[in-house]
Amino acid sequence: MSIKLIETALSEVLLIEPDVFKDHRGFFLETFQKKNYAELGIDKSFVQDNHSHSSRGTLRGMHYQLKYPQAKLIYVITGEIYDAVVDIRRGSPSFGQWKGFSLSAEKKRQLFV
């Protein structure tokens, strides 16, 4: 396993560069593998998997859950997005800070929030 984990300025917000296996047919990658991610310190049980499509120029709002917070693993399958994360968790070392991340289908990076 050579998944690369990149810490960000925000507490518990991580960039992940997964293993990508390329050949003449295209590529293969595991978007999530519980054991491998647990070894990186991401030991979460994902209970929901969503897929969305945004037309060029779309701005989506911020999402959060107070009563039942959810971890999110974000990646892009076509094109590119700019994802802004704002830390509104009281008691977090990075409370009140924000950071923006560019994610693209080409680079295949993931964002764990």
Predicted regions span which residues?
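Non-catalytic, conserved peripheral segments adjacent to functional cores
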Residues: 1-106
